[in-house]
Amino acid sequence: MRLRVDVIPGEHLAYPDVVLVVDVIRATTTAAAFLEAGAEALYWTPSLESALAFKDEDVVLAGETGGLKPPRFDLGNSPREALSAQVAGRVVVMSTTNGTKAAHAAARTAKHVLLASLYNAHAAARLARELATEEVAILCAGKEGRAGLDDLYTAGVLAEYLGFLGEVEPEDGARVALAVKRAYPDPLEALSLSAAALALKQVGLEADVPFCAQVAKSTAVPVLRGRVGEALIFKRA
């Protein structure tokens, strides 16, 4: 099975099989946390405006712009906040700067799209392995069009675990991700050095970083199940 890692989304990229979308700080971590808290479904939209179109008393709007909760949204993009949110049985509509856009890029061609993070790394890798017939691709969201150490490190963790599950043929991007993972024995160190973590520190949200650095704490894997309007519908596997 081919194992591929793309460090940022690209218009030219196509995916024939399974894609693990990674935005570890913070969207894909927060997505798993919302499912842990009992959310029925996650609607991932490509923009804040398209998220607001779903605003309703039965819907929870969550997202960020510049790391902070946007106006008229109920919640930000904090996984700590998501885990304790009153979302059981409800739809959570999410829009973020990088993660939701990466998911839409993957969904253009992939057979299966999963949201992965360190938080659900082992469960996400196992499911990807079960679903794949020829390739598992890991798509890093990056930060505003640039590669992110945090996502690349997470891709390395996923790639390593996929290798434990069975034989893989890593392409160059996967080898780079594996090398990054091996360079940082401590997940928190790798994440803390990233531009995404430094941006959170600037807005006083650095407490989210240790949460995002937890490895394999959740079995909740958001899987793409459909669409409504511009939104991708993710549900727990």
UniProtKB/Swiss-Prot annotation:
Belongs to the ComB family. It comes from Thermus thermophilus (strain ATCC BAA-163 / DSM 7039 / HB27). It is an enzyme of class 3 (hydrolase). It catalyses: (2R)-O-phospho-3-sulfolactate + H2O = (2R)-3-sulfolactate + phosphate. Transmembrane segments: none annotated. Gene3D superfamilies: ComB-like. Its EC number is 3.1.3.71. Its cofactor is Mg(2+). The keyword Nucleotidyltransferase does not apply. This is Probable 2-phosphosulfolactate phosphatase. The gene is comB. GO terms for molecular function: 2-phosphosulfolactate phosphatase activity; magnesium ion binding; sulfopyruvate decarboxylase activity. Keywords: Hydrolase, Magnesium. It comes from the Bacteria. The keyword Secreted does not apply.
